Curated annotation (Swiss-Prot):
EC number of the protein: 1.14.14.-
Pathway stated in the Swiss-Prot or TrEMBL entry: Secondary metabolite biosynthesis
InterPro entries named in the record: FAD-bd, FAD/NAD-bd_sf
Protein name, per record: FAD-dependent monooxygenase adaC
Top-level division of the source organism's lineage: Eukaryota
One GO MF term attached to the UniProt entry: FAD binding
Keywords, alphabetical: FAD, Flavoprotein, Monooxygenase, Oxidoreductase
Cofactor(s) in the UniProt record: FAD
Length: 414
């Protein structure tokens, strides 16, 4: 019997490749350190190139199958639509309006629902072993052993590292590779509102969009819908900006080495800074000194991971291949990490299908195909954060140019 493929991590990339391999009758086991009830309830943006790749790999499923299962507003018959409009969070005025004729090319997805939907997209259950924290990986391509803290030991043909930015596999196989911290400030809050309160407070500003994007003078305050139930709406918000720290000045909100416990605490400097922003409604009604202590607030440290081709070749000789954030992590704000994780899983599964007898060639082919896409995505993600946090004068210039172009288009139409 062919040894199974061992997948470390039950996130989006791990579940996706397990589901595709399982559908192709290729033995595999997923190992996850956490318990089955772990939650990642926030929503992410799935871009057309990401969800199309996934739907095709799962048997040419229709887009409606996905949106019915994962859209934050699915209970209302929604499709995870966002208007992609930008509003001045000081005045509430619309700055950048989307093209009304543009088709929907981004789907918002509740991350918990997406993981469940992927796992359920097949006849045979995916084999997930929870409570398995990796201790070591040893061996070579075709014969590799994974040992876990609970004493379990499994032999497989290949280890797929799908265990995220802080990858245990990578830290063992490539100990010299560590995440780079991006000098940005990101605070993320989660809250729940009764449906009636949401309809009165947020809907008049957002309409049917699942994101209310507010931009300020070098900072952003998006409010996003994570999930809607019959009685409540789960929301999250972000407060983000580039760090101002340098040799002369310390930025009290830039805490790159914050502990897990400290990351859940609200620093007084955050309350003071938000109060100084003079936000318009509805941002001011959620982001204030009275409301924030009632939310679950996290200080997200933004990290990037980059590896060389020599690095992955060395890991390949030890029977390890990387997918998702384990080899190309991007900042949560402005990155497309979830989409690239899905495409990684699809492309590696395609490379492995029918080539179980030549794993080396399959893994090499996967890297040949994915390399440029992923390396360029990491580079772009760093730039995109700063592009999305412009001075207000630049946003005003962009808004004016958009108006002029729209006016010219209207004249040409007549």
């Amino acid at each position: 019997m062919t040894p199974p493929i061992l997948i470390i991590g039950a996130g989006l990339s791990g579940l996706t490749i397990s589901r595709i391999l399982t559908n192709a009758s290729i033995p595999n086991i997923v190992f996850e350190a956490s318990t089955p009830d772990r939650s990642q309830g926030y929503a992410i943006s799935l871009r057309e190139w990401g969800y199309t790749s996934l739907l095709t790999a799962l048997g040419d499923l229709p887009l409606r199958s996905l949106t019915r299962g994962v859209a934050p507003d699915r209970i209302l018959g929604g499709t995870g639509w966002i208007d992609q409009a930008l509003r001045d969070n000081h005045t509430g005025n619309l700055l950048v309006a989307p093209d009304p004729e543009a088709k929907q090319c981004i789907v918002r997805a509740n991350r918990n629902a997406l993981r469940t939907w992927i796992a359920d997209s097949g006849d045979e259950e995916v084999d997930i072993r929870y409570g398995h924290r990796l201790r070591s990986v040893q061996g070579s391509m075709g014969n590799v052993t994974a040992t876990f803290d609970n004493g379990a030991k499994y032999q497989g043909s290949l280890v797929i590292a799908a265990d995220g930015v802080h990858s245990s596999v990578r830290s063992q196989i490539l100990p010299h590779v560590s995440p780079d911290i991006v000098p940005v400030v990101v605070y993320h809050g989660e809250l729940e509102l009764p449906r009636k309160e949401f309809d009165n407070l947020i809907r008049p500003h957002s309409g049917p969009s699942n994101i209310l994007a507010g931009v300020g003078d070098g900072f952003n305050t998006p409010i996003t819908v994570c999930n809607i139930t019959p009685t409540h709406v789960h929301l999250d918000w972000s407060y983000s900006r580039p760090s101002t720290e340098n040799k002369e000045n310390k930025d009290p909100l830039y805490r790159p080495h914050v502990s897990a416990a400290e990351a859940k605490q609200i620093p007084p400097a955050l309350l003071e800074e938000i109060a100084s922003r003079d936000l318009a409604r509805p941002w001011s009604q959620l982001l204030n000194a009275e409301a924030l202590p009632t939310h679950r607030v996290f200080n997200w440290v933004s990290r990037c991971v980059s590896v060389t081709r020599e690095d992955v070749n060395a890991a390949q000789k030890q029977g390890v291949v990387f997918i998702g954030d384990s080899w190309h992590a991007m900042p949560i704000f402005g990155g497309e990490g979830g989409n690239h994780a899905l495409v990684d899983a699809v492309e590696l599964a395609e490379a492995l299908t029918g080539k179980e007898g030549n794993l080396d060639a399959a893994v090499t082919g996967y890297y040949d195909r994915a390399w440029r896409r992923c390396q360029e995505a990491v580079r772009r993600s760093r730039q995109r954060f700063f592009q999305l946090h412009r001075p207000m004068r630049e946003w005003m210039e962009i808004a004016e140019k958009k108006k002029m172009m729209a006016a010219m288009k209207g004249v040409e139409a007549h």
